[in-house]
């Protein structure tokens, strides 16, 4: 079973992000807008209940998370991915570190950059054109996320789905 942990925003913000993703993100149909807290990891099906209990214990005392998407940014030249940057807060970083310090299915592959992906799989020309437009348009969105979502990859439908939500304190 392939799992991951994510913060999923409100439907209103998902709709705003998806307005861009529909046009610019090849993975639009496979996963909802989210901030990755723990990248994908594999477990044996028999370990699922243990994983759920570990998640519950690791989020104890972590409050709801205020997010503020502040601007369009990118991961160039490493990859032509454009995203809405989310201000890194102490609480957001604490939650990320709880699941990426090596005692829960390894460490993160990359430095934590909280964001919502809006465009990927672009040619260099597409990247330049789209990034220029998005940078000018800007974004200033705030909301509080109250749950951490355990997501799984449904291999039959080839998409990520929410398996369970965990309330933050």
From Swiss-Prot:
Q: Where is this motif: HXTX 1?
A: 34-37
Keywords, in A-Z order: Hydrolase
Q: Which residues form the signal peptide?
A: none
| Top-level EC class as recorded in UniProt | hydrolase
**What GO MF terms are annotated?**
hydrolase activity, acting on ester bonds
Gene3D superfamilies with a match to the protein in the record: Cyclic phosphodiesterase
The EC designation for this entry is 3.1.-.-
Q: Does the keyword Transmembrane apply?
A: no
- SUPFAM superfamilies documented for this protein: LigT-like (SSF55144)
Q: Which HAMAP family does the annotation name?
A: 2H_phosphoesterase_YjcG (MF_01444)
PANTHER family the UniProt entry points to: PHOSPHOESTERASE SAOUHSC_00951-RELATED, PHOSPHOESTERASE YJCG-RELATED
Q: Which family does it belong to?
A: Belongs to the 2H phosphoesterase superfamily. YjcG family.
Q: Identify this protein by name.
A: Putative phosphoesterase SSP1770
User: What species was this sequence derived from?
Assistant: Staphylococcus saprophyticus subsp. saprophyticus (strain ATCC 15305 / DSM 20229 / NCIMB 8711 / NCTC 7292 / S-41)
């Amino acid at each position: 079973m392939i799992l991951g942990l994510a913060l999923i925003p409100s439907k209103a913000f998902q709709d705003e992000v998806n307005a861009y993703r529909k046009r610019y993100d090849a993975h639009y149909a496979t996963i909802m807008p989210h901030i990755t807290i723990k990248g994908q990891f594999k477990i044996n099906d028999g370990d699922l209940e243990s994983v759920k209990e570990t998640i519950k214990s690791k989020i104890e005392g972590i409050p709801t998370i205020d997010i503020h998407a502040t601007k369009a940014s990118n991961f160039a030249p490493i990859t032509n991915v454009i995203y809405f940057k989310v201000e890194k807060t102490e609480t957001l970083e604490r939650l990320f570190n709880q699941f990426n310090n090596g005692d829960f299915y390894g460490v993160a592959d990359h430095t934590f950059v909280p964001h919502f992906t809006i465009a990927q799989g672009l040619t260099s020309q597409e990247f330049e054109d789209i990034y220029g437009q998005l940078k000018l348009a800007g974004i200033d969105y705030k909301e509080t996320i109250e749950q951490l979502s355990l997501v799984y990859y449904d291999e039959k439908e080839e998409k990520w789905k929410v398996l369970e939500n965990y309330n933050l304190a």
